[in-house]
A protein has these predicted regions:
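Membrane-proximal alpha-helical signals and transmembrane carboxylates
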Residues: 1-316
């Protein structure tokens, strides 16, 4: 095991006006978890305090080694070292390379990552991926977890992919659009933007997903229905019609031409989203053999027989 810790300088913690560009970086290694943390404790001149840990970045190789990952999580749980609400990330970069990014970011890596997650208003606050999330799927074994994937570039830190864990199985990297569509289908997003033709777009909000499982001839099918409010950003003429239509609706009068224009937009939104969802489902099935809608969470607890049949159908 290898691990790198970044600690803010005490003078910077006390001085709120400090730019906090530099952090103390501690590298530790050990043949097992106990030796790893003993090394870390021994190298630090003061007592190690993990209570203020802001982000835990795991290397992809650890996620793909179930035995080592299990030992690591078991040790963390037994020793109660890290808070379960610590944000979780994945990378392929070396620990020291990640920690050196604070000089580029002009702030500690953990602080930067926390701000990135907190500032993304598209996601529900309760759905932030944490160490506790990893503990949960480790116990459930079949639930999906979409962990933000970090890549360290020369002048910036890139978060444009996800790493999919299906319970204890590492399913691999997934592009951002596929991951966010899956999160949308799992009702973990507050808003989602769709690009239409002619550089037009719609932002969906107040998202609500419903799920129906049907069985016919021994095969289980899942249908996901998404309802949302839409904020349209497109050509000015249609926007004026939209406003005009809303004003008329108050008087219970609707212009048929305006109504048809809006219905066309609604139909395009529905078709575009359906095509994207189908592409997401097919891509995850082919590349990761993964169920992007996280059916285990919805079926495993109360309809176990149907869930097992659904998983069999999915894998075949």
């Amino acid at each position: 095991y290898q691990m790198a810790f970044g600690f803010e300088q005490l003078k910077d913690v006390a001085d709120e006006k400090s730019e906090k560009e530099n952090a103390s970086v501690l590298l530790a290694e050990g043949k097992d978890c106990m030796e790893l943390f003993l090394h870390a404790d021994g190298e630090n001149p003061g007592e190690m305090d993990y209570n203020h840990l802001k982000a835990l970045i795991l290397n992809r190789s650890l996620l793909e080694d179930e035995k080592r990952l299990g030992a690591f999580l078991g040790y963390l749980e037994e020793e109660n070292l890290f808070s379960r609400n610590t944000l979780l990330f994945v990378t392929e970069d070396e620990p020291d390379q990640v920690m050196e990014m604070d000089t580029v970011l002009k702030e500690p890596v953990g602080t930067y990552l926390n701000e990135r997650i907190a500032s993304d208003e598209r996601f529900k606050d309760s759905e932030a991926v944490t160490l506790g999330s990893l503990f949960r799927i480790w116990e459930n074994e079949n639930e999906n977890l979409w962990i933000p994937y970090i890549n360290c570039a020369e002048d910036k830190m890139i978060l444009e992919k996800y790493y999919l864990m299906q319970g204890r199985m590492a399913a691999g990297k997934v592009d951002r659009e596929t991951g966010e569509l899956a999160l949308l289908s799992e009702q973990k997003m507050k808003s989602y933007s769709i690009s239409l033709e002619d550089a037009e777009s719609v932002t969906l909000s107040n998202l609500c997903c419903s799920y129906a499982f049907t069985e016919q001839n021994g095969q289980v099918t899942e249908t996901v229905t998404i309802k949302a409010d839409g904020k349209y950003q497109g050509n000015r003429e249609l926007l004026q019609k939209t406003k005009h239509r809303d004003e008329k609706l108050e008087d219970l009068h609707t212009d048929s031409q305006d109504e048809n224009a809006l219905l066309e937009v609604e139909a395009e939104i529905e078709q575009t989203l359906e095509e994207k969802m189908d592409a997401m489902t097919e891509k995850l099935q082919q590349n990761q053999n993964a169920d992007g809608t996280n059916s285990y969470y919805k079926l495993g607890a109360y309809a176990r027989d149907i869930y097992l049949q659904y998983q069999t159908d999915w894998s075949s």
